[in-house]
Curated annotation (Swiss-Prot):
Keywords, alphabetical: ATP-binding, DNA damage, DNA repair, DNA-binding, Nucleotide-binding
Protein origin, superkingdom: Bacteria
PROSITE patterns linked: DNA_MISMATCH_REPAIR_2
rRNA-binding as UniProt keyword: no
Entry protein name: DNA mismatch repair protein MutS
Amino acid sequence: MPRKATTPMMEQYYQIKDQYPDAFLFYRVGDFYELYEDDAIKGSQILELTLTHRSNKSENPIPMAGVPHMAVDSYVNTLVEKGYKVAICEQLEDPKKAKGMVKRGIIQLVTPGTKMAQGPDDSQESNYLTSVVEKAGGYGLAYSDLSTGEIFVTHVKHYAEVVNELLSLRTREVVFAGNLSASDRDRLQKANITVSEPAELEGEHAEISYVQQKLTDSMEKAAVRQLVVYLLATQKRSLAHLQVAESFEIGQYLQMANTVQRNLELTQSATTGRKQGSLFWVLDKTTTAMGGRLLKQWLSRPLLSLDRIKQRQQMVQALLDDYFTRENIVDSLKGVYDLERLSGRVAFGNVNPRELLQLAKSLEATKLIIQTLVESGNPDLEKYGQGIDPQSELAESITNCLVDQPPISAKDGGIIRAGVSEDLDKYREAMNGGKKWLAQMEMEERQRTGIDNLKIGYNRVFGYFIQVSKGNVAKVPQDRYTRKQTLTNAERYITPELKEHENLILEAESRSTDLEYELFSQLREAVKAHIPDLQELGRQLAALDVFVAFAQDAEEKNYCRPSFSSKNEIAVKNGRHPVVEAVLPAGSYIPNDLVMDEDTSIYLITGPNMSGKSTYMRQLALIAIMAQIGSFVPADSAKLPVFDQIFTRIGAADDLYSGKSTFMVEMSEANEALQHASSRSLVLFDEIGRGTATYDGMALAGAIIKYLHDKVGAKTLFATHYHELTELDETLLHLKNIHVGATEENGKLIFLHKILPGPADQSYGIHVAKLAGLPRAVLREASSMLKRLEAEGAREINPSRQQLDLFSPVEVVEENPLKAEQEELLDEISQVNLNEKTPLEVMQLVADWQQALKEE
């Protein structure tokens, strides 16, 4: 938009806007933040603001919109959630004291990855900013949640691993030093990831050396430096809460591609994108926001270290065995606020009095938690409690300084306790004395004038005034009262005596308010020195919260403590799918065993659609993940290997981010397993080959099975509708056939949902089609067509291993096909609800049907 003729203020605006062309500029004017030009037009649409104009009388009025400064966070968050950046331009001096144009400057650039303000729905969500640097030998990747100050860093060899990490983390913004192709940029944007250029800062900054202190890898150092520089450049303040970067190897954890996590629905439903329907939804019995976020982190990075897994199990077992200790901890955790994010707000300088008091209350609750743990009588719980520092002195200093129920704002007074400051107490005494004097004056003036409804009031424009109703104006003493304001029903006056005391009262109020803010700022700075200790405490309480949640899950859902095998064997007794079990009526889920000894690497699973093959496969993966995060698992007993990787090909959804077809995605995911799986991996393949022609698909599926068997040796569950593949057990020694049972009763298909040995020996595809509601005419035509095709292309196969056709004609062949009219009549009969008919109506219907058949 071309620039209009400007005033000095607008000239200042344009100079600042030129520095942030890709951001919305929120420009502070008095009590509002204003947007101009294109920002105003676009912002008014997104934020549903009224679009008006500045300089309406000029030939070229400037589009303008505004938001109140008290509500700015919500508007900024709305823009940031949609992927935009927002530059906050503040008045840097008191407009009343400014000489000429008020100085303004950018105090913060809010971006999708640097959002500090979190709504109630975001409490369990981490908001990651990720930094990626490319060097010879690979990529350094560092990510941080600014609201908590945590920083993690790793390095990978291949760009595909970078993209997988970005998608798995669900990072909101990536700072990328390098050339990003248009297709890659588009893919990230489709995943709601904002791509930003690195920032630059002159000189050295203490935060950089502090967070890098444990790093030795140059690539990781570069990634962390780029991350911290971007944070400092955008936030424009000291970031004392940034934590020492924690370096990790991807191989330290069970590796799962983003697609695997999505297929298994670890943290969100694949259907809705929401928490409900995910494994996180089932397991999340956490009490604190910190615990919820940590549980999510654990789900995305299950452990490989058996020692660490067992340490977690020990804590869960101890809490499971002691109901009263567990319940006391839960009660105390309810009094713990989000220490991690409160610490971030302290460092940021925007913590308010209520939040500081929340911090103190959290520390008081921590003392109760420590007492409960130490007195539990369990060595593991006692040791955990002894390792927690309750920060008692800090809690005491906060509660001794702040009133019990402070206001949110620190600038309006009423936040500091009496006795904290002698000067403050004197100002308050003067204020109270002045207010008593005002009350006394009001009473005396009523007596002097005879005006019973005379009252003394105050506003910021006129200060203190005497208000008299219109009906009593004649009684006003004109020699002492000076009219100041006329209202519809009243007149307002001042007197020399009133103005004299007003100055004394307002001066005391002003000094009191200023001193309270000064004392609060001193308290905030004192708390800032404790940030590292508060962050450590937050981590300890978050982990305890997750342990308690796991113990509650185990008790309420009858989960068992899994054991681990070094012999690469699986023995799950009566295993259940945790999410499916949670949504079904209590006791209705049908459990299944899964036993694979050392000599068995592949189970080939056959059975009709909808019978539960996919559920059975996912069930094993979820049990393995739960076991490796330290949780108990849904089974009567479970012995598992420690898996190093999980690969899946489950579901028929296209890759929304890459634009690949279903078959290409299928082959890509299969290739991931073939290239990278080891004998310690878990592979789940569901209906590989269905995305292409039948014989192509069957050949590919068979070759993939043979490769997994001969070259990889991973524990594999392979579901297929190609029944010919079941003959592979004759040549592949480590492959066994299993199937999902089903039976037919009175012409109806009954899914048994039980896993049985051997291949399925009968097709129920036509029954499934019936369950789906396909018209009889379609089913009949499909059966006839399939019968002809089989007759034309029949080939000899083992009679005991007949082709398991999806639409088998055996069950539906009709010697005398029905006429169309008869078919319609049968459909009408099948749809009648006899329970809603009277006997007479039923008799009439039967008579009508008989007549119709006679006519045909």
